[in-house]
Amino acid sequence: MALGLSRHGYRRLLVFLAYPYWAGIIEAQWTPLIMASAFFPLLLPATLAKPQLGLPVALTTPTWRGVLACTVLITLSLLVMPRWPWLWAGHFYLYNRFVPLLIVPGPLLALALLRYRDRDALLLLLAALMPQRWFYDTFILWLIPKTRREFIWTIFFSWGAGLYRWYHAPHSYVEVGRWMVLFMYLPMLAVVLLRKAAEKPSIATA
């Protein structure tokens, strides 16, 4: 992931200071590898490990090599265990979750549609539509910042959720979702909306 980030400027390495990165590392999550797949197409099959997080990345950074790699992996997995999609779907109702867009003030994230031609806005909106459960799930949002200022401010706000988690045990996933929206999603929305049209790069370029 560090190699992919540094290809477009060392300022992107600031992402390792974001609270969701450390939350994911502590819990041994897939999110860093899913983010890396945005820079290395052959890693795109990693998005299949957590489809609810991988789908926004896969849809906003598609390449023929990545799609081919995913197709091969899915085909092989079906040959080994043909029933796995039904087994996976059968456990979905057990997944404690929330959808950021549906938790107040999450509906504000629909404002990303004002920048519908910007792939960063699309990534933000797709992520907000996906079921999530903890702070590390937002790490893919750090594909959105491009400038040093954008990284610094979004990282700063992310630690608001970190401090909250440190001093307060959330009572529900809805409560977790509200703090995720406030400290991760809304700052990213501000980045997308305030970025000048001439400064709108693609997700994987700077």
What name fits each language-model region?
Residues P45-T60:
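Internal transmembrane alpha-helix with an interfacial aromatic "cap," most often the third helix
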Residues M1-L43, T60-A206:
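Primarily membrane-embedded glycan-assembly and transfer machineries that use lipid-linked glycans
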